[in-house]
A protein has these predicted regions:
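Extended amphipathic alpha-helical interaction segments
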Residues: 93-214
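Amphipathic alpha-helical segments
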Residues: 45, 49, 53-89, 175, ...
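A cross-kingdom marker for long, charged
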Residues: 17-18, 175-268
Length: 268
C-alpha cells in the first residue's frame, strides 16, 4: 500500500520544478540545469533530512506517551522543530544558488513580474469578508488537529475558534513581510552576486530576514509562535487518553513512513 507520505514525496520533485519554473524564464540549457539541481536537492533532503524528521516525530510521540507535555516540554519540542527547519533551509540554499546566480537582467525582471502576479492573487484571497476568512481559517486549523486527535471535544473546538479569531490578521502581516523580502531579494540579485554570496544572503533572508527588511517582524514572529505554543499546550491538556493514543500512533506511523521513504532510491 502506498502511504500518503510516500505519495506526496513521489510528486515533490515535479512540484518543486514547476514552482521554480513559474518564476524563472529558462532556456533549454537552464532548464536542464534546474532539473539536475532539483533532483540533487530532493535526493539530499531524502537522504539527510528525512531520517531526522522521523527521529523528531518519534521523540514527540515518546514525550506524549510518558506525560511530558507541559508548557516547557512543548516549548522544547517546538524549538527542536524550528531547528530542523533551519537545518533544512541551510542545506537547500546552495542548490538554489547554483541556478539563481545565472539570471540576467531580463530574467530578474521576469521573476519580479511573476512575484507581483502571485502577490496580487494572494491579496485578492485576503480581501474576502472577515467572516469568510475566519471560517476558512477555522476549517483548516480544525482539519489539521483532527488529523492527529481524531474527533475534537467541545473545549478543543472553542480553543480553535478563539485562536482563529486572534490570529485572523496574521496572514496579511506575513504577506507584507514576504513582499518586503522579495523586493530585497530582487535588489540583491540585480547586483549579480556570486554563488557563495547568494547562498549566504538567502540563508540570512530566510532565517533572519528581519535584519534585512523590517526589524519589527521579529517581535511579531515571537508573539505568533507563543500563541501557537499556548494553543498546543491547551489542546493536549484537554485531550482524552484515546486522543493521546491516536496522536502517538499517528506520529509513529508518519515516522515509519518517512524512514521507509528515506531509504528508497529515487524513482527515475
Amino acid at each position: 500500500t502506498c502511504s500518503s507520505t510516500r505519495f506526496i514525496y513521489t510528486f515533490a520533485e515535479k512540484y518543486i520544478q514547476d514552482e521554480i519554473k513559474y518564476f524563472l524564464n529558462l532556456n533549454e540549457e537552464e532548464n536542464i540545469l534546474l532539473n539536475q539541481q532539483v533532483s540533487k536537492m530532493v535526493d539530499w533532503h531524502r537522504t539527510f533530512m528525512l531520517p531526522n524528521y522521523a527521529t523528531y516525530l518519534n521523540n514527540v510521540a515518546d514525550k506524549i506517551e510518558v506525560g511530558d507535555y507541559e508548557s516547557d516540554d512543548i516549548n522544547k519540542l517546538v524549538e527542536d522543530g524550528r531547528s530542523l527547519i533551519e537545518e533544512t533551509i541551510i542545506g537547500l540554499t546552495p542548490y538554489a544558488s547554483k541556478f539563481l546566480n545565472h539570471q540576467m537582467v531580463e530574467d530578474i525582471e521576469f521573476m519580479e513580474m511573476k512575484m507581483l502576479t502571485r502577490r496580487q492573487k494572494r491579496i485578492v484571497e485576503l480581501s474576502k469578508p472577515e467572516n469568510i476568512l475566519y471560517k476558512e481559517r477555522l476549517e483548516r486549523l480544525t482539519s489539521n488537529f483532527e488529523r492527529f486527535f481524531g474527533n475534537l471535544n467541545k473545549s478543543q473546538l472553542l480553543l480553535l475558534e478563539s485562536h482563529s479569531r486572534v490570529t485572523l490578521n496574521e496572514s496579511r502581516i506575513r504577506l507584507h513581510n514576504r513582499t518586503l523580502r522579495q523586493k530585497a531579494f530582487i535588489m540583491f540579485l540585480k547586483t549579480q552576486p556570486n554563488e557563495v554570496d547568494l547562498t549566504s544572503y538567502l540563508n540570512k533572508l530566510l532565517l533572519q530576514g528581519h535584519l534585512i527588511t523590517n526589524p519589527s517582524y521579529e517581535s511579531f514572529s515571537k508573539i505568533s509562535l507563543k500563541k501557537f505554543h499556548v494553543l498546543l499546550v491547551n489542546m493536549i491538556a484537554s485531550s482524552s487518553i484515546i486522543q493521546r493514543e491516536q496522536i502517538i500512533s499517528k506520529l509513529r506511523s508518519y515516522a515509519e513512513d518517512i524512514k521507509t521513504v528515506s531509504g528508497e532510491e529515487r524513482q527515475l
